[in-house]
Amino acid sequence: MPNITVTSLLAMKHKGEKITMLTCYDATFAHTACQAGVEVLLIGDSLGMVLQGHDSTLPVTTAETAYHVACVKRGNQGALILADLPFMANATLEQTFINSTTLMQAGAHMIKVEGAAWLGESIRLLAERGIPVCAHMGLTPQSVNVLGGYKVQGRLEAQARQMRADAIALEQAGAAMILLECVPSELAEEITHAVKIPVIGIGAGSATDGQVLVLHDMLGLSITGRVPKFVKNFMIGQPDIQSAIQAYVSAVKDVSFPAIEHGFSA
């Protein structure tokens, strides 16, 4: 696979070619995902739940994330490496810059931050200094205590209107990509068409420019046994993990995943 860059992802959006993303935390799975054709490897703070066993993403630190970024880098074969900025790692502009720099030096190609229009100043700061940023909107797990749990966001018209405006504002601030989590499919489609940058969805319908899933979820691995509505177990019917990931890539590319039952209505 040729090296995937921010420019590559933008070209894929313009050509209508779906982008595939998976969470990844180590060299072996990075190698396997690349062999299967995954374009973006996300070192998500989801590692706090699926690797460390926490009940939320909040305990994850920048140092822990950087460790896993470095692991993924060693097994990567051309995918773009996207790293989460953990909870409160962007509490101030100075912290945002220092922690983002740490992740980039560990091997990330892009940083993901959770929030809304208020992220504009941070995104502008990073973009102007050569650090590409993905803005994570909708259900933002780091804000789970404010949101009252893991709930669909943007169902009310006022919320939807604000989310559309925020997406445009963050693009104007310099965001290179947007990730929408658990928002109504119709709203996700509107936002995808409203911005020129790639929009990746998880629980956001099939009209976004690409999809992401947590690796453990799509392999049917769970400590709790609770499976989010937007997840499909791609291990079913497959002989090995690489085949399962290839099935995921193919399903995203031909838009057979996500199906209607994996999305949410307004």
From Swiss-Prot:
Q: Name one GO biological process term.
A: pantothenate biosynthetic process
What is stated as this protein's family in its record? Belongs to the PanB family.
Q: What is its EC number?
A: 2.1.2.11
- What PANTHER family does the entry give? 3-METHYL-2-OXOBUTANOATE HYDROXYMETHYLTRANSFERASE (PTHR20881:SF0)
**Which organism does this sequence originate in?**
Pseudomonas syringae pv. tomato (strain ATCC BAA-871 / DC3000)
GO cellular component term, pick one: cytoplasm
The entry's localization annotation reads: Cytoplasm
Name by which UniProt lists this protein? 3-methyl-2-oxobutanoate hydroxymethyltransferase
| Pfam families recorded | Pantoate_transf
Query: So where does Mg(2+) get bound?
Result: D45, D84, E114
The principal localisation class reads cytoplasm
Report the InterPro entries cross-referenced here.
Answer: Pantoate_hydroxy_MeTrfase (IPR003700), Pyrv/PenolPyrv_kinase-like_dom (IPR015813), Pyrv_kinase-like_dom_sf (IPR040442)
Q: Which reaction does it catalyse?
A: 3-methyl-2-oxobutanoate + (6R)-5,10-methylene-5,6,7,8-tetrahydrofolate + H2O = 2-dehydropantoate + (6S)-5,6,7,8-tetrahydrofolate
Sorted keywords for this record are: Cytoplasm, Magnesium, Metal-binding, Pantothenate biosynthesis, Transferase
Q: Where does 3-methyl-2-oxobutanoate bind?
A: D45, S46, D84, K112
* Stated role: Catalyzes the reversible reaction in which hydroxymethyl group from 5,10-methylenetetrahydrofolate is transferred onto alpha-ketoisovalerate to form ketopantoate.
Task: Enumerate the active-site residues.
Answer: E181
Q: Which GO terms of the molecular function aspect are on file?
A: 3-methyl-2-oxobutanoate hydroxymethyltransferase activity; magnesium ion binding
Top-rank taxon, per record: Bacteria
